[in-house]
C-alpha cells in the first residue's frame, strides 16, 4: 500500500471512487445523480489542488484533496472505495492530510463533513465548530463543519 501525488490522468478513476463512496451511505439514486457533478473531477481540478492517492497493487482505492481557505487547510475530498471502508484506509489518508497540512504551515485543518462521516472524523480528533445549512429537493440538510488543531 502506498500514497502518491495525484496525476492529471487520475481524474476519471477518482471520480468513480468519490461517487462509489458517497453511494455507500445509501442515498437515493436520484440524489446521487444530483450530486454527480460535484463528484466528477477534471484533470484541471488536480492541477489546482493538493491531492494524494492511496493505492493497493498500483490501483487507486482512495484519495484526498486539500485546499487553502482563509489561511487554514481544508479537506475538500476524502473518499475510500466501499470495499475498503473500515480497514484503516481513511485513517491513513486523514493522517497523511494532517502531515501535509503541517508541512504547508497550517495550524488548523477543517472540513465540511457528510453527516454519515462525523463519527469517523471525531475518532480522528476533530470536533464540530459550526454547521452549514443545505438542502436537496427541498429537504433541509445540516452539514457539520469540523476542525482539528495541528
Segments predicted by a language model, with ranges:
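A short beta-loop-alpha structural element at the N-terminal edge
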Residues: 2-16
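Conserved GNAT-fold acetyl-CoA-binding loop/helix
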Residues: 19-41
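Conserved beta-hairpin
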Residues: 50-62
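Conserved beta-strand in the GNAT
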Residues: 59-67, 74-79
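Conserved acetyl-CoA pyrophosphate-binding loop and the N-cap/start of the following alpha-helix
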Residues: 84, 88-96
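Conserved GNAT acetyl-CoA-binding A-motif
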Residues: 101-113
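Conserved catalytic-core motifs of GNAT/GCN5-like acyltransferases
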Residues: 110-112, 127-145
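Conserved active-site tyrosine of GNAT-family acetyltransferases
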Residues: 121-122, 126
Amino acid at each position: 500500500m502506498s500514497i502518491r501525488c495525484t496525476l492529471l490522468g487520475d481524474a476519471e478513476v477518482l471520480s468513480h471512487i468519490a461517487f462509489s463512496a458517497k453511494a455507500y451511505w445509501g442515498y437515493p439514486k436520484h440524489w446521487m445523480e444530483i450530486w454527480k457533478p460535484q463528484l466528477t473531477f477534471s484533470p484541471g481540478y488536480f492541477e489546482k489542488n493538493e491531492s494524494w492517492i492511496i493505492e493497493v497493487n498500483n490501483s487507486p482505492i482512495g484519495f484526498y484533496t486539500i485546499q487553502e481557505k482563509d489561511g487554514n487547510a481544508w479537506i475538500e475530498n476524502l473518499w475510500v472505495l466501499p470495499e475498503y471502508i473500515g480497514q484503516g484506509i481513511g485513517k491513513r489518508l486523514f493522517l497523511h492530510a494532517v502531515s501535509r497540512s503541517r508541512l504547508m504551515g497550517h495550524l488548523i485543518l477543517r472540513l465540511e463533513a457528510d453527516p454519515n462521516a462525523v463519527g469517523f472524523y471525531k475518532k480522528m480528533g476533530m470536533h464540530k465548530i459550526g454547521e452549514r445549512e443545505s438542502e436537496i429537493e427541498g429537504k433541509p440538510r445540516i452539514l457539520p463543519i469540523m476542525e482539528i488543531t495541528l
